[in-house]
Amino acid sequence: IRLDQPLFAFNPLKWDKLIEPLRYESSRREYAEEMEFIAREATSRFFAVMTSQINLQIATFNLANNDTIYKIEQGRYNIGTTSKDKLLQVELQLLRSRQDVAQARLAQETDRLRLRSFVGMNDTEQFELVLPEEIPQFEVSLNEALDRARANRSQFLDFERRRLEAESQVADAKGDRFQAMLTASYGLNNSGTALSEIYNDPLRQQRFNIGFNVPVVDWGRNKSRLRTAMANKEYTDYVIAQDEINFEQEILTQVRQFDMLRLQIEITKKSDEVAQERYNVAQNRYLIGKIDITNLNIALTEKDDAKRSYILALQSFWQAYYDLRRLTLYDFANKRPLYGNE
């Protein structure tokens, strides 16, 4: 029986015990991050349908209004209070409204099909989307967001894993520079004229040896390999430090943007209400002949733009909401992590 034990050699099992648990835990967290990415993508597709749905409502409303305006202009033209040019302008606007309705209906069907495909709904299931105007109320500080990200995100585990891998390469290179082997052996020895006599009262033979295997000349190979490993470790440390800075900057930007989007929703919602009221006033003034069709169209355009801006602000907020969850793996609304057994 012989036992050989290397001395000062690289021990891959020691490093695997440090690295592999990090790799496993990172994969668990990556799954949670992927789920939040899917939620974010679902939000984008939801608002694509929501936008096309609102556009169809706007186009349908404008078509009905333009049809009424065209009839009014026809009556005014017949009694000589408006010109042929204005009548043709209104008629052209009516034709464009019909085209807008057709295009909006097609866009809505296309977006609804994409949403169905993404969430796995069949063509027979009907649905109507409701605008998510109820915004969750919670505060997110930069320090808390950074702490949650450091504690939860797989990327920070990957930073530690990459550091350990670089250190293991240095340890491997150091282990190759000086090789020593400790050898121990135990055996039995005997002789005889017959095979059965060999196993009668054999002589014990014990040996303990220590040997060293040091290359006399390696032309600087091991020294160069160690220098390369140490240089790679320094480079890895630098890259990781930059990655940490970039990631923290991304979280900083996301938190600031999140607070700004709350304010943007309030502003665009108020603008939507004001633009709608202004259009109602302009429409009434047009009906009594106080303003012309051009000013009415300006009010109509501002009304439609304000509505779309409000929808876009809601979309930006909810996308940022799920981006923040993905970046920190934490649900700030319900105060709980998004992975693990908690």
Residue ranges, per PLM feature:
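Metallo-beta-lactamase
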Residues: 104, 154, 236, 313
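Bacterial Sec-pathway N-terminal export signals of envelope proteins
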Residues: 7, 15, 21, 123-164, ...
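Periplasmic alpha-helical coiled-coil/stalk elements that build and connect Gram-negative outer-membrane
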Residues: 29-148, 257, 261, 302-303, ...
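Amphipathic alpha-helical coiled-coil segments
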Residues: 34, 38-59, 75, 93, ...
